[in-house]
Regions:
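Non-catalytic substrate/cofactor recognition surfaces at enzyme active-site rims
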Residues: 1-549, 553-560, 567-571
Length: 572
C-alpha cells in the first residue's frame, strides 16, 4: 500500500487517477493507494478542484500555471512513492490514540438554525489523535502518521504557500524524531475550525499535535502485524432532485458563482439531457488484523460521521480520515442538513453540485464503512462512549484559576469580597427553585466555567425588561439570615453606559448594581440585602461567576419561598 498526503486544499479524483495510473506499473493498484490533503488554504489550486470557485476568473496564463502546478504535484507525489518503494526496510508498526483540544465546532446556531461561522461551545467535535509509527530494528522511529479532525486554517487564506498548523505539526514531529518522515492527515473536521488564529497560533497548534505524538510513543502502544488488508468501493450519494432547465436559465442572468454554476448545469443538460442526482463517492478501508481499521472518506466530511461511527463501531480500534482520494465537496449529516447553512447549502455551489444532499446521504456513507470494516470491528457490549466528541468542561480549570487568584496580591476591595465569600459559602443554598414568566431572552453563552450553555438574560440597554425566579423552600439561620447562591454575569462593558440593574425581593426594590468584570459587593441602604459577585471566568468584555445574595429578616411566602427579580434600568 501507499499513502501520500499533499499540502493542498483538496485533491480531486482526476489527480488521484493520474497518480494511480503512473504507479500501477510499480505494483501499486489504485485500490492500494490513498491520496489525502491537509486542506491548507495556502497552496496553489489543482486542476479540477472546486471548479466554480475559479470559473470565469482566470486568465489563460493562470490556467496554464494551474495545469503546470498540477503536473508538478503529481510528479512529486510519484517521486515520493517510488523513493519509498526503493528504500523499503523491515519495520515494526505500532499505533496509539491520544487527544488534542484546539478544534472547535464552527457552526453558530440561532434557534436551531445556522447563523454563521464562529465557535459553538456545545457543538460536537473530534479531539482524537490517532498516531501510526514505524520503528526500525534498533527501535528508532523512522515514520510517523498523525490524524486530527480540524480545518487547517489557523493562518487563514493568504496569497502565499504554507502548510498552516499541519505543516508546523510535521516540522515539529520531525524535530522530535530526527531522521523520521511524518505525515499529517485530517479527520472528519469539515465543520470544525481551529480556536485561535494567526501564524504563531498555527505553530502552537502544530506543536500541540507533536507533543501529544511524543507522549503517546513514550507510553504503551499497540503493535500491528503484517500488511493491511485493503478493501474499497464506490457508492452513489443521493442529492435532492435537481432544478429544471428554466431555473438555470434564470440563474444565468445573474453573476458570480451562481452564474458559473448555471453555465455548468446547462452544459450538462445540453450534453446529456439531464443533471445527475447522485455523487460518485469512494470509500476505502485498511485493516490490520483485528487491531486497527483505518477508514478513508472523500471530501470535507462533517464531524457527525466520526461521532456516529465511533458509536456504532469499536472506537478504540478505529481511525477515520477525510479529504482522501477525491473532493466532491462537503459531506453533510442529517443534523447539518436540518440546521442548514454553509456546509449544507452554499458550499455545494463551489463544487459544481446542483443542490443539497438528500438526508439519506448519512446512512449511505455509514453503511458503506460498516460493510467494509466488517463485524470484527462492531461496537463491543457495554462499550463506553468515545470521550473526545465534546469539549472538556472548564470547571476544573476554573477552580484552579480562582485558587491562584485568591493566593495572589489583589486590591483591598477584591480581598474584602473574597473574605466575604469565604464567610458565606458554608451556609449558602441554591437560589433558583423555578423560573417565573418574564420578558427575558434565551441564548447560549459562557457560564462561570467558560462553558457554552443555555442561559436566560436581559439586555442592559432594554429598559424595564425583567428576569424573574422563585427560590426553593428556605430555612433561616439563627440570626434570621438567608444566603442564596446562583451563577450568572453582569453586562457587556463596552456597551453604552446605562443605569445598571435593580434587584427586587418579593416585588420590592432592594438594591441597585451595575456592569462589572471584577469581584464586587453591593449593599442596600437599610443593610438588609447584600449581593456579592465573584467572577470565575472573564473575557475582554464580560464575565461569568457566582453571586451570593444575603437577606436579613425577609418573609418567605406561604410555601416558604421568595420571589426574586432583576430589572434593567436602561440608558441613563
Amino acid at each position: 500500500v501507499a499513502v501520500v498526503v499533499l499540502d493542498n486544499c483538496g485533491v480531486p479524483a482526476g489527480v488521484t487517477r493520474r497518480l494511480a495510473q503512473r504507479l500501477v506499473k510499480h505494483g501499486i493498484t489504485p485500490r492500494h493507494l490513498v491520496v489525502a490533503a491537509t486542506h491548507t488554504h495556502n497552496a496553489p489550486s489543482l486542476v479540477g478542484y472546486a471548479k466554480v470557485v475559479w470559473a470565469g476568473r482566470m486568465s489563460p496564463a493562470q490556467k496554464k500555471r494551474m495545469a503546470e502546478y498540477t503536473t508538478f504535484a503529481i510528479d512529486r507525489m510519484e517521486s515520493a512513492v517510488l523513493r519509498a518503494l526503493k528504500n523499503r526496510q523491515l519495520m515494526q508498526l505500532e499505533w496509539a490514540q491520544g487527544r488534542v483540544g484546539f478544534g472547535g465546532n464552527r457552526r453558530v446556531l440561532n434557534n436551531g438554525k445556522w447563523a454563521g461561522f464562529g465557535f459553538q461551545r456545545n457543538g460536537p467535535v473530534d479531539h482524537s489523535l490517532p498516531v501510526l509509527a514505524a520503528r526500525d530494528a534498533d527501535g528508532k522511529v523512522r515514520a510517523l502518521w498523525a490524524n486530527y479532525a480540524c480545518h487547517c486554517t489557523t493562518v487563514g487564506s493568504r496569497n502565499r504557500v504554507g502548510g498552516d498548523w499541519a505543516g508546523f505539526a510535521n516540522s515539529s514531529m520531525e524535530t522530535d524524531f530526527p531522521g523520521a518522515v511524518s505525515l499529517m492527515s485530517i479527520g472528519c473536521g469539515a465543520d470544525i475550525g481551529p480556536v485561535g488564529s494567526g501564524l504563531q497560533i498555527a505553530e502552537k497548534h502544530g506543536r500541540a499535535i507533536a507533543s501529544e505524538v511524543k507522549r503517546l510513543l513514550a507510553t504503551k502502544t499497540t503493535p500491528l502485524t503484517g500488511p493491511p488488508a485493503v478493501s474499497g468501493k464506490h457508492i452513489q450519494l443521493p442529492l435532492i432532485k435537481p432544478q429544471p432547465r428554466v431555473h438555470w436559465e434564470a440563474q444565468l442572468r445573474g453573476s458570480g458563482w451562481h452564474h458559473q454554476l448555471a453555465k455548468a448545469m446547462l452544459a450538462k443538460l445540453d450534453a446529456t439531457g439531464s443533471i445527475p442526482a447522485q455523487v460518485n463517492y469512494p470509500v476505502s478501508v485498511w485493516k490490520f488484523g483485528d487491531d486497527l481499521a483505518m477508514v478513508f472518506l472523500a471530501g470535507e466530511v462533517v464531524v457527525d460521521y466520526s461521532v456516529r461511527l465511533n458509536r456504532e463501531l469499536d472506537w478504540t480500534r478505529l481511525w477515520i480520515s477525510a479529504w482522501a482520494n477525491d473532493m466532491p465537496g462537503y459531506i453533510p449529516s442529517r443534523r447539518v442538513l436540518a440546521e442548514g447553512g454553509y456546509e449544507a447549502d452554499f458550499s455545494q455551489v463551489y463544487y459544481e453540485q446542483p443542490g443539497r444532499y438528500d438526508p439519506k446521504v448519512e446512512d449511505a456513507v455509514v453503511n458503506a464503512v460498516k460493510e467494509l470494516v466488517g463485524r470484527t470491528f462492531e461496537m463491543l457490549p457495554g462499550q463506553k462512549t468515545a470521550p473526545f466528541h465534546t469539549l472538556p468542561s472548564g470547571e476544573a480549570d476554573t477552580f484552579n484559576r480562582v485558587a491562584k487568584w485568591a493566593a495572589a496580591k489583589n486590591s483591598e476591595e477584591e480581598m474584602m469580597v473574597l473574605q466575604k465569600v469565604r464567610q458565606l459559602i458554608p451556609n449558602a443554598v441554591p437560589a433558583i427553585g423555578r423560573m417565573l414568566p418574564s420578558d427575558a431572552e434565551q441564548t447560549e453563552w459562557f457560564n462561570f466555567a467558560g462553558d457554552h450553555v443555555r442561559r436566560v438574560f436581559i439586555r442592559q440597554k432594554a429598559k424595564g425588561t425583567t428576569l424573574r425566579w422563585q427560590s426553593p423552600k428556605l430555612v433561616k439561620n439563627a440570626k434570621g439570615l438567608i444566603t442564596l447562591c446562583f451563577t450568572g454575569g453582569v453586562g457587556w462593558e463596552s456597551a453604552p453606559k446605562t443605569g445598571g440593574f435593580t434587584l427586587l425581593i418579593g416585588g420590592g426594590e432592594a438594591l441597585q448594581f451595575d456592569v462589572t468584570r471584577k469581584a464586587n459587593r453591593w449593599v442596600s441602604k437599610d443593610i438588609k440585602t447584600e449581593l456579592v459577585y465573584l467572577p470565575t471566568w472573564t473575557s475582554l468584555e464580560d464575565s461569568g461567576g457566582f453571586f451570593f445574595l444575603t437577606l436579613t429578616n425577609v418573609r418567605p411566602d406561604a410555601n416558604g419561598a421568595i420571589s426574586i427579580a432583576v430589572r434593567s434600568l436602561g440608558p441613563d
